Amino acid sequence: MRIAAIQSTPVILDAEATVEKACGLIGDAARDGAQLAVLPEAFIPLYPSNAWAKGAAAFSGWDDLWERLWENSVDVPGPITERLAEACREHGIHCAIGVNERESERPGCL
């Protein structure tokens, strides 16, 4: 099995643009002969690594950041997972992709 380990950055806090990017990367991997495309952890919409950085507590924009993170996170299953699945079907490939998943039973929870 040929596996494409894709190192790429998301379009920060923009799920729609990141899904388009991911679908393109999936297609590229398939054209290069991969049967499995593996994309980064929390690729949609981003991995909020700075939340644990030194001095992060002094950042005044956390409320806006967390709201945008939730708004751009993924319902599983949902429209975003369907678009990714369609890209995989179209190109005859499988993918593993990390997402921030919204919890539908508890709004505001990831």
Regions found by a protein language model. Give the residues of each.
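Catalytic metal-binding/acid-base residues of hydrolase active sites
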Residues: 9, 43, 100-101
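Active-site beta-strand/loop signature of hydrolases that rely on acidic residues for catalysis
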Residues: 18, 26-55, 65, 88, ...
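Extreme N-terminal starter segment of soluble prokaryotic enzymes
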Residues: 1-5
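N-terminal phosphate-binding loop and adjacent alpha-helix
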Residues: 9-24
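Catalytic-core segment of enzymes that process non-peptidic bonds
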Residues: 67-110
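Active-site catalytic microenvironments in core metabolic enzymes, especially phosphate/sugar-handling
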Residues: 60
